[in-house]
Structure formats: C-alpha cells, structure tokens
Amino acid sequence: MTSVKEQAAISRLLSFLQEWDNAGKGLRNQILTTFIETNEGKTGPELELEFSQGASLFLIRVTTWLRIIYMTGLELEKILRSIGIFLSAVSSNRYLLEFLEIGGVLTLLEILGIEKINEEDKKESIKLLQIIANTGRKYKELICESYGVRAIAEFLAKSKSEETQEEVQVLLETLVHGNPKYQNQVYKGLIALLPCGSPKAQRLALQTLKTAQSIVGATHPSIVDRVLTVLSTVHLEVQYEAIELIKDLIHYDVRLPLLKGLVALLMPPVKETSKLQAKIFSDSSILQTTTQLPVFLQQAAAAKTIGILARNDLNLAVELLNLRVVHGLMSAMGNTDHSNSQRLASLTLEYFVQMFPLVEEQVRKSMGDELYQLFLNDAEILYTKIDSIQADILAANKVNATTDSCDCIDNSSISFSTGSNDMSQRGYTNDFEKLHSKSKE
C-alpha cells in the first residue's frame, strides 16, 4: 500500500503528464525549457526521483513528439537537448534502450538530411549520436546498420558550420574505433568525402583517415587517386593534411602507386594545358586565373610533397630517382604559367642535386653552365631569373638520372650537405610554418 507522500508524488506526475498531453507547441517549449534548467547533469536515479519513478513516461512523450514534428522544420533544439539529458545520465541504459526501441537512431539520422531543419538542431542530433556511439560496440554497429555512415558523411560535406563539422568528426572517429564489423565502412565513407566542395570537411576527413588507416590496416584502391586529387586545392590547410596522410600511406601497399602518381603530376597531360592555351586565345582574362588551374596546383603540391618525402627517407629518394623524378622536376621548373610550381620544383631538385652526384652531373649538363650557376646561387628564386629560352630548356629536358643509368648508387655516391639542405627545407616549408603560426594565435 502506497504512502500518502508517494500518492502525492504520483498525482503530481500524472498532472504533469496531462499538462504535457494537453499543451500546444508554445507551452511544450516552456515545459522543456524548465526541464533542461532543472535536470541537466542529473543521474538516472535522480531523474527517477524527480519523476516519481516515471521518467520514462516523459521520455517517451518527448521522443514521440520529435518523431511527429521533425519533418516539419520546426525548432527541435529543446526536444533534442531534453532527450540528451536522459541519454547522457549516469546509470541510464534503460532510457537509451527505450529511445532506440521507438526508432530513435533512424530519426536522428534522418534529421541530418532534411534541408529545412536548421544547423543547430542538426548539431544536437550529432551530439545524441555521439552519446549513443560512446555507449558501446553494439550501438556503433546499430548506427552503421542504419546507413548512418553515409548520412553522417553527407552532412559533414554539406554543413556550413565549422563547429558542427568538428562535432561530426568526433562522431566518425568514435565509429571507427572499437567497431571491427563496420570500421571499413567508415573508412570508405571518409575516402568518399575527399572530393567534396567543403575545404573544412576535406581537412577533417583527411585527419580522420589517418586514424582510420592505422586501425583498418589494408588500404582501399581508390585512396591514391582521391588523395592526389585533393592536392589540386587552393587551401593550404587542406594540402597540409593531404601531405600528412601521404606520409603515412607510403608505409602501406600503395607506396609505389603513390610515388608514381606524384611524379606523374609534375608533368600535366598535354590535353589539359592545350585546353588552357585555347581558352587564353579566346579570352585574355583567363591569363589572370592560370595560377589557380587545378593541374598546376597539383604540380606545385606534388613537387612539395616529393621534397618532403625524399628528405624524410633516403630510400624513398632513390625510388623516386628510378621513377625519373629529376626529369619531372625540371619540366615543372620550365612551367612559366605557374611560378609556384617552378619555385617548389627548384627547391626539391636542389635536394636531389646535393644528395646525388649522379643527379648533379646530369642536371648541370642539361641546364648548361650559365643556367646551372643561377640554380646553384639561389634555387628558390631561380624562376625570377630565367628567360623564355632557359624555361624551354628546362621543360624539354631529357634527363634520365636513375640508378640504372650508372653502375650503382651507394653511400659513397651520396653527398650529405646539411647546411644548404636546411636552408632549402626552410624555404620549402615556409607556407606550412605560416599556417601553423596562425592556428596557434
């Protein structure tokens, strides 16, 4: 038999629930505001005490209302925050199960894809998915089984809020950890994100891919082309993350395709540059935008990446030699349509010349004494000193400085000139240093 006190508490609960059931949109928002203010941070037992062991009855009502109105575009933030109080409460697994039983995960994922729902509401939906994913492996699997990876990745690509995008990254990282059944699905979803039009989404996807790659192990065949395509970006912070991922990927089974791809980018296809020439003849204003042509941006980024890889690993430098990287670098140095390609290719070539006497000999013969002396004086500003004839000499070079072109390359044929190499590295990476200094401010 219940006590008078318990009966009074039950009566208050029933009165509260009846008020909710009879309330319109405005009053329900007021009820939720009060609920959030008085119950945020409470544990499961504390919520039960607050609702006289009937907290689930209120959760079901709030969730049902969410499912009824979420497609209308009405504000959902208070509803989602109220549900979050239940799901995040300590000792609240019961609430989570009740939320999932009535299709909570599917509702949260569908919210992400509805255009008329505002960004803040979608961010709250992501936060609830984070809570669910952090509860355990089977809940991560449930999200993935509900086509969650695709919905979450598409939202990351379309989101206009950097803060929201960072919340999505946290969710994707959670889904790739401790989720062996679906970690490959998350990994492929991240790769699919790379061509998207949002620089922030690209950057976050690249960062998360580094983590995912170390967990998954085996690489997906499409990752090479996707990452190399990202090098055409005009955004230095995206380029930086792409190069960082490439530095990891060369330790996997895509090492050779990656290196071949980078060397190939040094020499854009003739059809691409021919298209540009035709446009220039028909529209002189195109001249002002050639520095942003994707193939030239890729060319410059490839020269930078090759320099970083070669400086970090001498064995890689030798592999690059065998892929005729010197020929490609000199060709890029002759690209008068893109000065940054010339500058970065020149700095990278300087390293190979310093490290390999074989390269030094062939480059000197190909350039001629006058041009080679200009190169030695200051590789970084060589592009400002050369004329059109010298540029043509570089672009049309026939250098074939590979290990096959001499008897051998061993330690005795490698020059370690640390002083000038350090100077080259400073000039070579100054874009990244500027970027990092800004991010620290």
Language-model features: locations:
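Eukaryotic modular interaction domains in large regulatory/scaffold proteins
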Residues: 226, 241, 260, 264-270, ...
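Core register positions within helices of long alpha-helical scaffolds
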Residues: 82-86, 128-131, 170-174, 208-211, ...
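Charged catalytic carboxylate motif
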Residues: 78, 124, 167, 204, ...
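Elongated alpha-helical scaffolds that mediate protein-protein interactions in large eukaryotic proteins
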Residues: 2-111, 118-124, 132-154, 161-166, ...
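Eukaryote-specific, cytoplasm-facing alpha-helical/coiled-coil scaffolding segments in long proteins
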Residues: 110, 153-154, 201, 329-332, ...
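A short glycine-/small-residue-rich loop at the edge of a beta-strand within enzyme catalytic domains
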Residues: 218, 233, 253, 293, ...
